[in-house]
Amino acid sequence: MSIPTVINAAGRAVMTELNGKPAIPFRGVGKYRPSGNRYGPPIPSCTDFPPDGNKVVTTLEEALLRCGIRDGMTISTHHHLRDGDLISNRIFEIASVMGVRDLVWFPSASFPCNEPVIKYLEDGTINRIEGSMNGPLGRFVSEGRMKGTAVLRSHGGRVQAIQDGEVKIDIAVLVAPSSDSFGNARGTGGNSACGVLGYAKADAMYA
């Protein structure tokens, strides 16, 4: 069944529905006033962790299992490591081996180093990407080869989507150059110092 389209304020035909959700076409600057309330983040609890506060696990696979990874989840990542981010690739490699399907990848951005993710778009591990897509991955999406519909989000628009409940993060994988055993991370130290980790703040709060 085809999805209806409308002409937005920029004169472009756009869909009224994206990935099964209603879409609000651009009406012009200052023409749309949102309603409702911000989405509340979950309440954290120390009861979910060992008495000594040590949250360390030995592998990313174990971490994903403990988070209850399953079909259709939204997994977020940040891009502070830029073109050196190999962890995002590993997330979906693990998910593919587990047989997990139709994930939504919600990165703050992706880079040429994430080209291996194309394999997991093709085999159905990932349904779609909602974020900034660059390099070979951006080309793949632009050619219409992704199963779901891509949603390109600015950095600020991404945070807005999180806080307004438009996107609900199931698992946030937040890479950091260094961290203590309780999970207090920083962008200095280690072999991959990258500076402040601001892009990951909303993910840490709302996942």
Pin down the residues of each PLM region.
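Conserved alpha/beta enzyme-core scaffold
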Residues: 2-207
